[in-house]
Amino acid sequence: MSIYVGNLSYEVTQDTLSAVFAEYGTVKRVQLPTDRETGQPRGFGFVEMGSEAEEAAAIEALDGAEWMGRDLKVNKAKPREDRGPSGGNRGGYGGGGGRNRY
């Protein structure tokens, strides 16, 4: 299971985020998604710890903590399929303008 880390500074790197979480146990993996077009960080990331106990300790200590001038939001990451509809499907009708044929 992963930890979601939100409200991150755009200056954060995988190394700096890993160092913060390493205080609470073994960091197995850090992901910092970036914007496809700009390559800039998107302000959130995911951290995978060595055990559930280490994850719980990190979440307890870091949720709401200030780091790099921002208040972190730290909690268990939800699996993709549990996040509800993606918003990609906007429904039927193909679109045609507002002109009346008659």
Curated annotation (Swiss-Prot):
Keyword terms, alphabetized: RNA-binding
PANTHER family, per database record: HETEROGENEOUS NUCLEAR RIBONUCLEOPROTEIN 87F-RELATED
Protein name: Putative RNA-binding protein RbpA
Gene Ontology MF annotations: RNA binding
Record carries keyword RNA-binding: yes
Naturally occurring in which organism (per UniProt): Nostoc sp. (strain PCC 7120 / SAG 25.82 / UTEX 2576)
Comp. bias (Basic and acidic residues): 73-84
Residues in RRM domain copies: 2-79
Annotated Pfam families: RRM_1
